């Protein structure tokens, strides 16, 4: 229903549906980034009706010891499945059951090597406003035992060496995100969040082999500025940015 409303040409939404559809669809943007030479985690895209033996043969040929399956269109980790290749080869029904269950809700899925560094080093979430880097945080999962306020440890990203690797990747990503078209004019998005993880192919941290894990539309991504230590004045900056964008598009 929401997709139908957003895609209706009579709907006056911002960012326009075409842009949001690109951001929401990992297959679209990961494919574009790969073809543009932007580092991503090698990815297999499959339908819910996937042939399991064929998929396992492909995973085995890549020598992935562990892998993750994510539904395209899922969010906040919903529907993610984590598997060990050796176990699934011995008992493929576990993977079959996963697709039987989740194909009720999703048409397509992506399959990737499990990156050990995601939990070990966390994920760098970088925020870009008006095409410029503004700030970044790092989130690290907390084991689900005991009570805690937030599901992750969240801190400002201040490591200059890591930022020196991530920011150039982010700049390349912004260049490949399609322009918005609104009121007959082309323009850039107001805010984009670019999330990066280390390390590609489970290389050691010293490799600094960060890659793009996902991107988010800035207005919906969450700024994390309600977390202690994250002090960027996001409300004031975004308010000014959206007013400038409105003036630009409505002139």
Each language-model region and where it sits:
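Basic side chains
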Residues: 26, 70, 125, 139-140, ...
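Generic beta-strand hydrophobic packing signal
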Residues: 43, 136-137, 194, 215
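Active-site nucleotide/adenylate-binding loops and adjacent lid/helix of ATP-dependent enzymes
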Residues: 3-10, 17-121, 164-168, 251
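Generic domain-boundary/flexible-linker signal
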Residues: 54, 137, 223-226
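Phosphate-binding site of ATP-dependent enzymes
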Residues: 78, 82-184, 197-200, 208-211
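Short beta-strand-initiation
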Residues: 64, 121-123, 189-193
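ATP-dependent carboxylate activation and anion-phosphoryl transfer catalytic cores
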Residues: 142-145, 165-251
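Domain-wide signal for the mature, well-folded portions of proteins, strongly enriched
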Residues: 1-6, 12-17, 190, 200, ...
